[in-house]
């Protein structure tokens, strides 16, 4: 006697953010935009697709609260982090504090709060097109700049001049981005 074998279709893995991004119908979403807004969204899309840096000015630093699962207490806990806000034209780009600094080189929250008005490079890491905002990473853009700087001999020899951007000024020190 043969026993029937049930064949179940394998469950499809959930789609990644990148896969969901490529499924968006941009023509429908961008239909009512002005030319300036369309240009801004196109530069955001290009940064997300190609991991290329775009430049923007920090216009503010806001605290954002989210609930995260703590495995030790087995409860949801409210966690608040500061996020830099960049608005090139109308689209809000949020940069969490965790995406501002390299691991091991984190700065206190007051340094981020003193960066308002600073011009920074960032890479878009998530696009929330329906909600009208994007999430960026200064950390990834800085990593790309460091790679470029390290592989150009004329930029890091004694006596060479480099471009710098003033990021933050405090009572005893300042933070400068050289590239």
Label every PLM stretch briefly.
Residues 1-179:
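Single-stranded RNA-binding regions, centering on S1/OB-family and related RNA-binding modules
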